[in-house]
Amino acid sequence: MVQKSTIDFAKDLADHNTKAWVAANRDALNAARGDLLTLGLELIERADEYDPEIAQAGLEARHLTRYNRDPRFLHGKPPFRTDLDLFFNAGSGAERVGYNLHVEPGDCYAGASLFIPSPPALARMRDLNATRTDEWNRIISAKPFVAAFPNGIEAYAELKTAPRGYSVDHPAIAFLRMKGLGTRSKLTEHQVCADDLVDRLLPIFRAVKPMVTFLNTGA
């Protein structure tokens, strides 16, 4: 479960999104991050219930997204992110699709993603989609997948046309245009803070595991 204090911290940060406020509430920030790290450790410890590769990878619960934005990319946005994320995979972060939990007031979800892949990882995933399109379509149309992720595959960003080397008429063009992708199974704040959160997350991860395995082929 995620502690209610973690949700409350994210809400407070949204209302007081300044460097001075964060500096004055550093202990609350560290407690919120530590809360998600504890949850991440439990998810890794139970990985044999959804992905044996994760279970065998010897991971640590240390894969939290940085909470602060890079000032080079602010463009008028608040200085700090108001979400906390767990992300873990069985390899390099930018090379392999992994499982994730996103905790943000009013927008909590779980699934799998590689929203900002390295160029080689993106090229590899595009090649998989282009050359094994039928297999890909079977994975994302499977009943457990559709039930868990009614919005299907979501793009982090996408090209306006086909990537170099691919036809705009390719049957997988919708996915080939994606520059990063993920799935989202929506969760309420009540569900995120409930004692049975991990038991709720396991079937979500099991539903997306075939996608994870497919997109990590050759990684």
Task: Give residue ranges: language-model regions.
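Short histidine-centered catalytic/ligand-binding loop motif
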Residues: 25-32, 114, 125-129, 193, ...
